[in-house]
Amino acid sequence: MLTVRAIGLGAALLAFTVAATASGTDTLLSVAARYYAKAGQIATVTGRDSTMDYYQRLLDDAGFLNAPPPSYYTADQWQHSVRGFSQLDLSLARQLLAQSYQPMASIRGLGETFVRSSKDGTMQPVAVYVPPGYSKDKPAPLLVFLHGRLESESRLIAPQFIEDVADRTGTIVVAPYGRGYYDYRGSESDVYDAFDAANLAFTIDPHKRYLGGYSMGGFSVFTIAPMHPSDWTAVMCIAGSLLGSRSQLVETKLSNTKFYVLTGARDDTVPTLYPTLTAIFLRDAGIPVTFYSQSDGTHLLYSLRSILSQAWSDMEAGVVRTPEGLAGGGQGLPEAVP
């Protein structure tokens, strides 16, 4: 009897999941159709270069809702991520359709809002995660988190493991959209607009303001942090690298800034040698740096979640473990993105 009940419950849960997925897909496609019909009007608000990117997100999300989880995700973790970023993308589209934007200060948990660009006056999306323990009476750490190429702020911030670390450390996470084709080039000011908006919306600890980036974002932190070095307590580079052309600027502007450099030993997109050479350069320049390598890690952020949790905790605590024994084969910093 217990087995029959269990099977019945399992069937009911499966039916509910299928129905919820179908409903979610219908909602995404319905909003996408409304968005497409008003794309010209929306372009005057967001700028023409990214207007259709947001439309494409809705279509992609609808496909993800019906897709099986990738082999490196559990079903629950995948569903949490997909639900998270699809809800953020829906919120983005609905706000643009209504031309009414959620105040950043009102967000609790996972949310999406817009910040007006100081560069061109357009409205630019920013994903936000505010941990449940946040109180305006207690200053919180802030991480401004930069996503990778061909990704989005919503997909970067939605996974459960990001929320888990943010909850554990009490960190507010703010992820601006990198609308430049590569390396946040041309949209650097959007990062600082998001940073300024977060400092106005929340009570932020001035001694715990961090800049982090993954993949393309991991390269970009070395361009963006030197622009206003006093804004950042520490910088985290995940599956990215410092390039030789930026080394003098980093050495001059960020000599006292703590760096946390992360890599997967099996990364075949940004070879682990790149972050290794970055850590060697920073160490030899006398800049505080800690290096983390995940032996089974690839370029996927999910595969680096263990060392991300450790590095995040070290960053919050101000811990620096100067790396020893790193081998770069006598090579200097890379000059270009692989």
Predicted regions span which residues?
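C-terminal catalytic histidine-bearing segment of alpha/beta-hydrolase fold enzymes
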Residues: 25-43, 52-54, 59, 260-262, ...
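Cell-envelope and extracellular/periplasmic
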Residues: 147-151, 199-202, 214, 221, ...
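Gly/Ser-rich "nucleophile elbow"/oxyanion-hole loop immediately N-terminal to the catalytic nucleophile
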Residues: 132-139, 184-216, 229
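Short substrate-entry loop that stabilizes the transition state in hydrolases
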Residues: 134-185, 244
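A domain-start/cap signature at the N-terminus of enzymes
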Residues: 22-140, 320-338
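Primarily recognizes the serine-hydrolase "nucleophile elbow" in alpha/beta-hydrolase
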Residues: 200, 207-255
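Alpha-helical scaffolding within the catalytic cores
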Residues: 155-163, 194, 240-251, 273, ...
